[in-house]
Regions:
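Phosphate/dinucleotide-binding and metal-coordinating scaffold of catalytic cores
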Residues: 1-374
């Protein structure tokens, strides 16, 4: 049986003064034979940079997934089940739980119900497609971020690839040497991104991406979501750019803007949005609700704060009833948003409900988007 080694990460909050240490996270590393397989595959991909992206992705996934599955069978336990977290003593004395799956208690904890990630990591993890675009950029020679060969896919997607500064929420992850984890590529300006990113994504989706296209995508990729929201700098603030995908049945940016306008007219507090024409298609730009005056806020999703009651509006209300800073003010907002989603048929999900931590508990963050239920 292969012995599992762990990589230690330090979990801080960059939304709280002096960036206190929340705890320690331990990620299992891939065995040496799989790390060697990955290194060999990346070198092989680098020599095939003119091959279509779809072919490269398929070959990489097939080789690495087969190797990881083989090791998991030998170890008689999946790699994902081995993640560990432990709160710091100072946080145990003065902090708060950073998810329903991480109660404020001593000792090492594992994700509930054999989940792949803790909730706070799932809130920041990139989707598989975005991660693959990063991987291909590295294979073609990008020097933007150092990614260890023995890092598993979930460690890459949740720690090593989200941007070191523009990541979701207010949790910063550092190495034991104190270096902030994540991509170091500069976040693009809106004026440059409006022209470059849509074209780069179109090339990637059609299997025609080159290194320049991949870097354009990777630099703006900091947030989770199927539609690969891209972060751009507009003036002094960061905004989230949402674009359509090739397999969309309708214009997702346009329909999201329709829902946001209807919500505002219904008295629901929302993020600020605007539509922008980019190369003949439409993009939706949304203000970041996990930032205030350019600084991060400590946010967690309803999915993370409810754990076993995912998808339940009652579970969302319980967050405010049990640990809300102002439940009398926020509970009517929950009802209004619930009624809006039900009456309009808009797709709703617990990961899209964000809560901001204040001194006396959680506050409901403004709504930041619905999508058509297609």
């Amino acid at each position: 049986m292969s012995k599992c080694s762990f990589r230690k990460w330090l979990i801080h909050s960059d939304a709280i003064q002096d960036e206190p240490l929340i705890g320690e996270l331990y990620f299992p590393t891939l065995p040496s034979e799989i790390a060697a397989e990955r290194t060999s595959e990346e070198s092989h991909s680098n020599g095939e940079s003119m091959m279509s992206m779809n072919e490269q992705q398929k070959k990489s996934l097939n080789r690495l997934t087969a190797a990881e599955m083989k090791w998991s069978a030998r170890a008689m336990a999946s790699l994902q089940d081995s993640i560990r977290f432990r709160y710091s003593k100072a946080w145990l004395d003065n902090g708060f739980p950073i998810g329903a799956d991480l109660p404020l208690q001593e000792g090492l904890m594992k994700p509930l119900n054999a989940a792949r990630l803790f909730g706070f990591l799932a809130d920041r993890a990139l989707d598989g497609t975005s991660a693959l675009w990063f991987e291909q950029a590295f294979a073609m020679g990008s020097q933007g971020t150092a990614v260890p060969a023995d890092a598993s896919s979930i460690e890459r997607q949740s720690i090593l690839l989200p941007h070191c500064e523009a990541h979701a929420g207010g949790i910063r992850i550092r190495s034991t040497e104190g270096e902030a984890a994540g991509s170091t590529l500069p976040i693009p300006m809106e004026s440059n991104a409006a022209a470059g990113i849509p074209l780069a994504i179109q090339n990637a989706e059609r299997g025609r991406a080159d290194l320049r296209s991949l870097l354009a995508i990777a630099a703006a990729t900091t947030l989770p979501g199927r539609h690969s929201p891209r972060v751009v700098v507009s003036g002094r603030d960061e905004e989230v750019m949402t674009l359509s995908r090739l397999d969309d049945l309708c214009s997702i940016p346009v329909w999201r803007e329709i829902y946001m306008r209807l919500a505002r007219e219904s008295g629901i507090e929302t993020a600020q949005t605007r539509l922008k024409d980019v190369r003949g298609s439409t993009a939706l730009l949304t203000s970041r609700i996990d930032r205030a005056a350019g600084k991060p806020l400590f946010t967690l999703s309803a999915r993370t704060l409810t754990a076993g009651r995912m998808g339940s509006y009652l579970g969302i209300a319980d967050i405010l009833n049990s640990d809300g800073a102002s439940p009398a003010e926020d509970l009517p907002k929950v009802w209004r948003r619930m009624a809006f989603a039900l009456l309009t048929g808009a797709a709703d999900a617990p990961e899209r409900w964000l809560f901001v931590r204040e001194e006396f508990g959680w506050r409901l963050a403004p709504a930041h988007g619905w999508r058509p239920n297609t």
